[in-house]
């Protein structure tokens, strides 16, 4: 950010990106004028994350594109427009050596990633304007009560909670509302 920005900026982060944004704001408040956290994944239950990691490890790929698509549609991508979902599949689904398909990711890195989501809530410095969007269709929620309580206590009137009627893929399911939340924080 020192190289790319002329000064402090508003940082927007979705899911794990929200965790990164919170950590950056806590470590380098001089770089941040505000945060927009889109269903951030922070301080999640370790048992839940272990289950997710175990599921990924036991079944990291799909028979074909249709199966991968169905898994997305049946999960948190159900509200994402078809063209956006197809773009995701085109860009990130790759052929595996055994004739199956999988996501263009590192499975070992992803298994480690799930444990990162269990870390405690890093609260930005007092006075950091922060908007958190919580997706209400996610159960259990990624934006936990613990996270919201910590931010309310640490930021007071500088914290805004928005609860949206959608699943976890907030920026893709609600692009107009997401853009408005970002514009509001930039103002």
Q: Model-derived features: where do they sit?
A:
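Flexible "cap/lid" loop of the alpha/beta hydrolase fold
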Residues: 23-26, 31-65
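Core-facing hydrophobic residues within beta-strands of well-ordered domains
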Residues: 32, 158-159
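Conserved acidic catalytic loop of the alpha/beta-hydrolase fold
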Residues: 1-9
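Short beta-strand immediately N-terminal to the catalytic nucleophile in serine-hydrolase-like folds
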Residues: 11-13, 38
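Gly/Ala-rich beta-loop-alpha elbow adjacent to hydrolase catalytic centers
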Residues: 13, 17, 21
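Conserved alpha/beta-hydrolase catalytic His-Asp/Glu region
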Residues: 63-118
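Catalytic histidine-centered segment of alpha/beta-hydrolase-like enzymes
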Residues: 164-175
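Conserved serine/cysteine hydrolase catalytic core
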Residues: 95-155
